[in-house]
């Protein structure tokens, strides 16, 4: 066993443990036995007993020595490593010292850097906040790329879409919000955005104006999608007066041409129909009906896309294109029409539609003014036609016929009057081309004058009166239903009354002469009321003379009662009522004369006591019986003549 100095043992505790283990009796030590069991595999055929203790001890010493050598070798290596490590530690110490100094330096720098970093973080947070605010502002107060692209596409394609108007609504919303921000906060960015939105708005207005004319073409009441787009377009551009007026002008131009084309097509179809333009009245009515329908459609169409306050002006301007073609067409039709009644109807149609268009458009529109001018023209043509027709009839009027009835020209003139006045009656209280008074003035006044002039060709006053009464009676019957002609009827009645006076005077004189009492009446009437002598003593009024006259009167009355009066002049009077009135007047006047004679005969002072004469009541009853007997056949005859 090698000698190991105490210093080494003290230094190496492992060696001390090995030495202690070798000094013990290993076979009695339980721990050693465990170790022996552990190292037994290392020794072949060796049993742990007292005999082998020495051998084992030697072997262990050798093993220990070898281990010590190995330990020494390894320890030298470790020592070398430790020495190197020590050198490294020295170097590391130096390095750490340097690092410590540098760290102190860096520490001061880091503190400054941290302070700067904190400041930068604050600035970064502020910048990020501002950036977020800017991004949020730009997001809320600017148009997206898609929206800007939509504006470009609409500008290039020329078609407006729903999305286009959504973009414009957003543009207006942004501009209004920016305006509020500028007014309330003085926001400069909002002012710039507002100016930008203003430019976009102006650009969009230009796009709308450039595309409206295309949208207006082929626009109908059923074009619902187009109407929605145009309604939004007008709503947007209404804020810009100049652009809005330009759009209105474009609408008027486009729709005027469209209305003109439709009007031309309607006229082409009317010309191609079998009757063509052979019926001017129907042609004018159809044209006005078509124009009224087109105007109604145009009114409905414009009301659906724009405000109603511009409607009258727009309709007026749109219909302006139809005024000249319609006026020319009506004047052409008017130039070919000669019938005054048809012209009168045409004028009333024009007046009727003029009133309708005043309500539909406005009072002083181009179309209503044109219709008013046409009405004046038609009125002049109608008056000229009536005058020409009446003058022609008056020139052709022949002398009265033997029956003293109205000549055919009178009937034709009254037919013209009936045609005109019936239209006036049907029209009622509406405006007329000619009022009933004017119709009377242009038709019946010349007729009455010509009738009076034509009657002068007759030989006797009775024939003149009968013919005049017949004509005036027919005229009065024609105007009797018109309340406006009350004074005219009174005037005609006065003229009939005047001619009836002549007729009654002549007839009564003739009856008195035929009855034989005319001379007696004249003599009685010629006696001076102051005469005191009896009338029977006067020459020509003797009882015998008066008696003969009374007998002659009685015979006349008998013959008169039995006569059918076929050849009486009053039988030629057309109207049974007038004829009966004249007969009643004849009877009344005749009875007045006879009553005066009877009064003279019945006066005792006149000396006619023994003279027999018919009582007045008897004569009156005989004459009334005649009247009743003739009433029925006369009425039938009057109806047949009428």
From Swiss-Prot:
Query: How is the protein disposed in the membrane?
Result: Peripheral membrane protein
Places the protein is found: Golgi apparatus membrane
Q: Per its UniProt record, what Pfam families does this chain match?
A: COG6_C, COG6_N
Q: Which UniProt keywords apply?
A: Golgi apparatus, Membrane, Protein transport, Transport
Q: What is its main location?
A: Golgi
Q: Does the keyword Lipoprotein apply?
A: no
What's a GO cellular component annotated to this UniProt protein? Golgi membrane
Keyword Ribosomal protein tagged: no
Task: Mention one GO biological process in which this protein takes part, according to its record.
Answer: regulation of cell migration
Q: Which InterPro entries does the record associate with it?
A: COG6, COG6_C, COG6_N
Domain of life here?
Eukaryota
Q: Report the protein's function.
A: Required for normal Golgi function.
What quaternary arrangement does the UniProt entry report?
Component of the conserved oligomeric Golgi complex which is composed of eight different subunits and is required for normal Golgi morphology and localization.
User: Which family is this sequence assigned to?
Assistant: Belongs to the COG6 family.
- This chain's protein is named Conserved oligomeric Golgi complex subunit 6
> Source species, please?
Caenorhabditis elegans
Q: Which gene encodes it?
A: cogc-6
